[in-house]
Amino acid sequence: MRCLLLWMVVLAARAAPARSLVYRGEAVGLRADGPVAFAVHPTDATLALRGRLIFLEHQLPAGRRYNGTVELLRYHAAGDCFVMLQTTAFASCPRVANNAFRSCLHADTRPARSERRASAAVENHVLFSIARPRPIDSGLYFLRVGIYGGTAGSERRRDVFPLAAFVHSFGEPGDPEAAARTPAPSRQSRPAASGLTSSASLYDRALARSPQAPPPRPAPPRAARAGPRRPERVDETTEVEAATRAGSAFALTTPPAGPTASPAASPSRAFSAAAPAAAAQPAGDTPARFRRQLASILVPLCVLVLLLLALCAATVNCALRRRLLPCSRRVYKPRTCAACGSGTCAGRPPCRGAAPSAPATVVALGSRPKAPPLATISEE
């Protein structure tokens, strides 16, 4: 028994340590190099957490192609709200092994207007990255992923994966300049409702809602409605517009004004109430994408039409030359040789005409001289 325990301890010590962390969700899984990304200010130029989205068993979408969205959110503890940093809509993604969002035909990325240093590129195996990281960037981030099939009526599933970033500065306790330049959380996003704050966790809140604009002000009198209404501050424009332009099927609209949800209300009811409004929005139907799809259809069609016209023109030309224009046909007849009278040599040398027949030689038997007798030969 002791030998067995000692052998297990040695085997565990020699085993290679785990180098990645796998999160299993409902629609997709996430494989990250670690739960937290570290950086040192101002030494490191980029903070990045690498990983990829994968399909585990029984998670492959139905059909040959699927669509989806990837959204990068940040949680602000001071305002108890979420901020949309980037929205990416993918379309016509093939099912390549177990990799999600690989070799997609279309990818439309819309970063936030206020913060463009943070981004996510899951197609390049980068879960999120921050350019020129500062201590103020330390915090909790969420990667919200939604996948649905390309066919109508397919089920839409979403998952939220927590990520964290930690930026430390050895020379300074913090970054007061960056904190002074950061706008108030009330301008960036709206705090969650009291029901969701008390009864739901950060995971449920990030899954069920998106950053919203501050509550609208009361309507002006009728005299003021005649002129065009413009926002007083540009900062009030939220990242929800960017998510809507990107064609995200999961960007939730602002719920209508009504009684505040009770603390006993569950986040699933809030999400189910906002789901029909999100499903009514077209997924990834922007004018730029429509123009690209139209060009991808018209260009091959024009090439095929030109090839068909060229083939028809060649056929008509051949028919005219062979059928309707007999004068253009030339029949080759070899010349007759003047010497031999045949057309095989066409009068070219070494043809020298027909060979003359040799005269027959007639030999008479009686004209031959007789041989002398033997006696005469002996005397001589």
From Swiss-Prot:
Keywords: Glycoprotein, Host cell junction, Host cell membrane, Host Golgi apparatus, Host membrane, Membrane, Phosphoprotein, Signal, Transmembrane, Transmembrane helix, Viral envelope protein, Virion. Residues 315-380 are intravirion. One of its GO terms (cellular component) is virion membrane. Residues 21-293 are virion surface. It is found in: Virion membrane; Host cell membrane; Host cell junction; Host Golgi apparatus membrane. Residues 185-201 have a biased composition (Polar residues). Residues 212-221 have a biased composition (Pro residues). The keyword Cytoplasm does not apply. Residues 1-20 form the signal peptide. The keyword Oxidoreductase does not apply. Residues 249-269 have a biased composition (Low complexity). The chain crosses the membrane at residues 294-314. It holds the Pfam family Herpes_gI. Residues 172-269 are annotated as: Disordered. Its main location: virion. Glycans are attached at N67. InterPro entries: Herpes_gI (IPR002874). It is a single-pass membrane protein; Single-pass type I membrane protein. In epithelial cells, the heterodimer gE/gI is required for the cell-to-cell spread of the virus, by sorting nascent virions to cell junctions. Once the virus reaches the cell junctions, virus particles can spread to adjacent cells extremely rapidly through interactions with cellular receptors that accumulate at these junctions. Implicated in basolateral spread in polarized cells. In neuronal cells, gE/gI is essential for the anterograde spread of the infection throughout the host nervous system. Belongs to the alphaherpesvirinae glycoprotein I family. Interacts with gE. This is Envelope glycoprotein I.
